[in-house]
């Protein structure tokens, strides 16, 4: 670092090679993710009012996604200016902190949902006390405090770096610093791999419980399996490429901190993988609100009520609108959960926690 000029004589990375793809993807995420997450937040709020603990996790997930989306306009500007941050050091720290923390907050809440659904399907009676709204609120508070604290180190360091071409990088330094490399290893193993492994174990238990249920129809088993795999796929597709490159960059730096060759080769791929993490903000509400007939019906009703409200300007009509978000993975803790077109009945049993699931179709209209 040249202290007189504030210029960092680091690796030569060409910021012009990827100035179109990340901002284009971010604009797409803003356009799709903002309205869908607002709708998902309202749906989750309705779940919480019905004393459904899953709604607490969904609400926190939507809040995290919305906070992340609010930072994207500045990152669009950053990439369109060829990785040149023009909004000052304070905004760089704040928006970078929110941007990167959201990755691990989202993963943590997806993991919470996985554990909650495993307990609901595999052990509905034994762990009923853990599946309460108060417990979900406490767990959510711990998640926020833990993830924000674990990712707060950059707030106490200078995160603006000017290269030889007078570009001001925000939250990007090539090569990285040693403390950043060790923090990245923590993020990869504790923030990403551990929760994802836990999700795999939970959904393995879910699939085993569903498979052993003789009263669950084959079609419903397929739906539950598809939803289970979709949740795991969100984490894998959205976050795995980024963490693979993050791990590679950190490992190479710790082994050869003077070598810029690897940083220069993976620069474009690293930026693209980082942009792909934003697709999580689109996948979350789509997965939980649009993947099955019941949820699609509820969303259609919600949009219909919203249009009626805007057209008639009668707030009471909107207040009386009802939304119930019940799916095979979001059914309430009670012994009977309703979806559009089906009723999920869980009859009592004396066989411990092996509670069979049965779908009772309503009479034809």
From Swiss-Prot:
Superkingdom assignment: Eukaryota
Protein keywords: Cell membrane, Disulfide bond, G-protein coupled receptor, Glycoprotein, Membrane, Receptor, Transducer, Transmembrane, Transmembrane helix
InterPro entries membership: GPCR_Rhodpsn, GPCR_Rhodpsn_7TM, GPR4_orph
A cellular component term, taken from the record's GO annotations: plasma membrane
GO molecular function, one term: G protein-coupled receptor activity
Subcellular location: Cell membrane
Membrane topology term: Multi-pass membrane protein
Activity modulation: Activated by a network of residues that connects an extracellular-facing cavity to Glu-147, a conserved charged residue buried in the transmembrane core of the receptor. Protonation likely drives conformational changes in extracellular loop 2 (ECL2), which stabilizes movement of transmembrane 3 (TM3) and a series of rearrangements that connect the extracellular-facing cavity to Glu-147, a residue only conserved in proton-sensing G-protein coupled receptors.
Residues spanning the membrane: 11-47, 52-82, 88-123, 132-158, 175-212, 217-252, 263-291
S-S bonds: 11-260, 92-170
Glycosylation sites: 3, 166
Gene3D superfamilies for the chain: Rhodopsin 7-helix transmembrane proteins
Family annotation (SUPFAM superfamilies): Family A G protein-coupled receptor-like
Residues the record marks as site: Required for activation: 147
Parts of the chain on the Extracellular side: 1-10, 83-87, 159-174, 253-262
Similarity comment: family membership: Belongs to the G-protein coupled receptor 1 family.
UniProt-recorded name of the protein: G-protein coupled receptor 4
Protein species of origin: Rattus norvegicus
Organism lineage string: Eukaryota, Metazoa, Chordata, Craniata, Vertebrata
């Amino acid at each position: 670092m040249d202290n007189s000029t504030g210029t960092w004589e680091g690796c030569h990375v060409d910021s012009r090679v990827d100035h179109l793809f990340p901002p284009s993807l971010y604009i797409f995420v803003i356009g799709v993710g903002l309205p869908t997450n607002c709708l998902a937040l309202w749906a989750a709020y309705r779940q919480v009012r019905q004393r459904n603990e899953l709604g607490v996790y969904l609400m926190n997930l939507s809040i995290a996604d919305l906070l992340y989306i609010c930072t994207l306009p500045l990152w669009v500007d950053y990439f369109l200016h060829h990785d040149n941050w023009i909004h000052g050091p304070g905004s760089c720290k704040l928006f970078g902190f929110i941007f990167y923390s959201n990755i691990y907050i989202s993963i943590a809440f997806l993991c919470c949902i996985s554990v909650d659904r495993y307990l609901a399907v595999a052990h509905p009676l034994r762990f009923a006390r853990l599946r309460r709204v108060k417990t979900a609120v406490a767990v959510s508070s711990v998640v926020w405090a833990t993830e924000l604290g674990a990712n707060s180190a950059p707030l106490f360091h200078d995160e603006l770096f000017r290269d030889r071409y007078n570009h001001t990088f925000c939250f990007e330094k090539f090569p990285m610093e040693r403390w950043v490399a060790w923090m990245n290893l923590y993020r990869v193993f504790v923030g990403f791999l551990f929760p994802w492994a836990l999700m795999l174990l939970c959904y393995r238990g879910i699939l085993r419980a569903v498979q052993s249920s003789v009263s669950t129809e084959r079609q419903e088993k397929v739906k539950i399996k598809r939803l289970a795999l979709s949740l795991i796929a969100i984490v894998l597709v959205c976050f795995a490429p980024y963490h693979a490159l993050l791990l590679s960059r950190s490992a190479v730096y710790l082994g050869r901190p003077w070598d810029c060759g690897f940083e220069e080769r993976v620069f474009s791929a690293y930026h693209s993988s980082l942009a792909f993490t934003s697709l999580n903000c689109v996948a979350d509400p789509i997965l939980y609100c649009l993947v099955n007939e019941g949820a699609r019906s509820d969303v259609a009703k919600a949009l219909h009520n919203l249009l009626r409200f805007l057209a008639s300007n009668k707030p009471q009509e909107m207040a009386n609108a009802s939304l119930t978000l019940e799916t095979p993975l979001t059914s309430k803790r009670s012994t009977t959960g309703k979806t559009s077109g089906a009723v999920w009945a869980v009859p009592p049993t004396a066989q411990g926690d092996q509670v069979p699931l049965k779908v009772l179709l309503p009479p034809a209209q």
